[in-house]
């Protein structure tokens, strides 16, 4: 039988089951409300397992504790059912009086149950169905328990079913929440202030990216979904908030990949009277403590292939290499003179098959060589520093070498996780760099920055020496949950319409 015929038969079977369930719902409507809202559980499944799972059977019998639980029926066989709530699963014992009720249920129905808590001879907790009520009639059948929801695209489209059917998916998103909460606690504990800045901006700034465009009808102006909150956060530092951070969405009208989604979550934070070295130290400490607190270990194991894995060690001091030195380190056939002039660097890039534009300077060519030959090889936690000024329009020039900036990017597993730098606080230098970005935009670079006159004006009031950083929350969660695609850590990733 062809796959197409199998799919058609499966759809026909599902339609039949849905019709049968709709008929049951009609019968329930005829005798009352099949969607009541008057049941209140006293316990969750996991809390019961934690509090009473180790107790002796006799002790539970003697206690005769009555509990109320609510959730979805995911198994219904004979004398026992399995109920799944937001915390986990627990068994239900079908008493003689409850057999008719149990028989009327379909997998996926949501019920409320009150009864005495017991332990079986095998050591499993269960709740007697002494009192019971249907709370929600499910009209669509759950995926087969042995195969789960296997279709990857369907999992992303119908995440609500994915969460019901696949416990590991639930675990990933619970862990994501804990990661974000740890970061908030860590920064709050260091006197950072959480703020919110505009998502709709008249001038998109803070990053080099193509924005989403919209129109504000009341003001009759074109606006953009923000690509980064950076320039607003630094305005707040000018205003006297010396440590600020924001965890929120950014939007970039660019391609989809396993590492990119047009809508994504970023942490950005700024600290006055600090430089990029201070933020590298902070990042190293934060990530080390994050792994230990959330995962219980500073060693994070990730899958590279079917039979290959790697362990990222967050306990050791993170490697620190400049862009220039990293190119030479990972390309031992190259010498310094091969990449220290526009002509020689272009020759190297050409040999690597890198397409180039005529207006690229040495710094841009070096970054292209770095991304082609180095980035994917940065497996253990590594800071890459001293990015060329040409590709760092908001970063402070290095005092000893103005060709580069006091900037770093942080990599693990060949993925960029963070980007930070000592902030450019020279208003005149910033204005000149904005003008250069505008020239590049006029030359056809859609990702080049706009000129932000108000931000330059803010700098003219004086931005104290400041360092700032952005960390991609989605990529960080991918790293710590060993997820292969960014879609695996987004509850509702973008998809084409069905």
UniProtKB/Swiss-Prot annotation:
UniProt cross-references to Gene3D superfamilies, sorted A to Z: Bira Bifunctional Protein, Domain 2 (3.30.930.10), Nucleic acid-binding proteins (2.40.50.140)
Major localization class: cytoplasm
MF GO annotations: ATP binding; lysine-tRNA ligase activity; magnesium ion binding; tRNA binding
Chain sites annotated for binding Mg(2+) 1: 409, 416
UniProt cofactor note: Binds 3 Mg(2+) ions per subunit.
Keyword line: Aminoacyl-tRNA synthetase, ATP-binding, Cytoplasm, Ligase, Magnesium, Metal-binding, Nucleotide-binding, Protein biosynthesis
Main EC class the enzyme belongs to: ligase
Pfam family, one: tRNA_anti-codon
Biological process terms in GO annotation: lysyl-tRNA aminoacylation
Subcellular location, record wording: Cytoplasm
Positions annotated to bind Mg(2+) 2: 416
GO cellular component: cytosol
InterPro entries, per the entry: Aa-tRNA-synt_II, aa-tRNA-synth_II, aa-tRNA-synth_II/BPL/LPL, Lys-tRNA-ligase_II, Lys-tRNA-ligase_II_N, Lys-tRNA-synth_II_C, NA-bd_OB-fold, NA-bd_OB_tRNA
UniProt EC number: 6.1.1.6
The protein's required cofactors: Mg(2+)
Catalytic activity entry: tRNA(Lys) + L-lysine + ATP = L-lysyl-tRNA(Lys) + AMP + diphosphate
Similarity remark: Belongs to the class-II aminoacyl-tRNA synthetase family.
Name of the featured protein: Lysine--tRNA ligase
């Amino acid at each position: 039988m062809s796959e197409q015929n199998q799919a058609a038969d499966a759809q026909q079977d599902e339609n039949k089951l849905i019709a049968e369930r709709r008929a049951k719902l009609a019968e329930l409507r005829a005798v009352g409300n099949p969607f009541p809202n008057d049941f209140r559980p006293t316990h969750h499944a996991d809390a019961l397992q934690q509090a009473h799972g180790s107790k002796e059977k006799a002790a539970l019998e003697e206690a005769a504790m009555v509990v109320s639980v609510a959730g979805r029926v995911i198994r219904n066989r004979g004398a026992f059912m399995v109920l799944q709530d937001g915390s986990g699963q627990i068994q239900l014992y079908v008493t003689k009086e409850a057999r008719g009720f149990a028989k009327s249920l379909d997998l996926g129905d949501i019920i409320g149950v009150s009864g005495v808590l017991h332990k079986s001879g095998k050591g499993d907790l269960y709740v007697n169905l002494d009192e019971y009520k249907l709370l929600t009639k499910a009209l669509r059948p759950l995926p087969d328990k042995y195969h789960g929801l296997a279709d990857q695209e369907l999992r992303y489209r119908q995440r609500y079913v994915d969460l019901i059917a696949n416990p590991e998916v639930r675990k990933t998103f619970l862990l994501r929440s804990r990661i974000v909460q740890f970061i908030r606690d860590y920064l709050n504990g260091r006197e950072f202030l959480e703020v919110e800045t505009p998502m709709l901006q008249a001038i998109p700034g803070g990053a080099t990216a193509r924005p989403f465009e919209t129109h504000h009808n009341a003001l009759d102006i074109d606006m953009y979904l923000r690509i980064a909150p950076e320039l607003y956060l630094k305005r707040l530092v000018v205003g006297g908030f010396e440590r600020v951070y924001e965890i929120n969405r950014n939007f970039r009208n660019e391609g989809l990949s396993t590492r990119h989604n047009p809508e994504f979550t970023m942490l950005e934070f700024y600290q006055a009277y600090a430089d990029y070295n201070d933020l590298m130290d902070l990042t190293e400490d934060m990530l080390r403590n994050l792994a230990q607190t959330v995962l219980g270990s500073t060693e994070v194991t990730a899958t590279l292939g079917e039979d290959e894995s790697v362990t990222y060690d967050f306990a050791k001091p993170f490697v620190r290499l400049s862009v220039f030195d990293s190119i030479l380190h990972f390309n031992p056939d190259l010498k310094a003179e091969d990449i220290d002039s526009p002509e020689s660097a272009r020759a190297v890039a050409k040999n690597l098959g890198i397409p180039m534009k005529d207006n690229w300077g040495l710094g841009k060519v070096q970054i292209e060589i770095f991304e082609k030959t180095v980035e994917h090889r940065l497996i253990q936690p590594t800071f890459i520093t001293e990015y060329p000024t040409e590709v760092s329009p908001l970063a402070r020039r290095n005092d000893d070498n103005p060709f580069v900036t006091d900037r770093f990017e942080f990599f693990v597993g060949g993925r960029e996780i963070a980007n930070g730098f000592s902030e450019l606080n020279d208003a005149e230098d910033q204005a000149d760099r904005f003008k250069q970005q505008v020239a590049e935009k006029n030359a056809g670079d859609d990702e080049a920055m706009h000129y932000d006159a108000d931000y330059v004006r803010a700098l003219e009031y004086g931005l104290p020496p400041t360092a700032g950083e952005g960390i991609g929350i989605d990529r960080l969660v991918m790293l710590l949950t060993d997820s292969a695609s960014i879609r695996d850590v987004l509850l509702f990733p973008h998809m084409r319409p069905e």
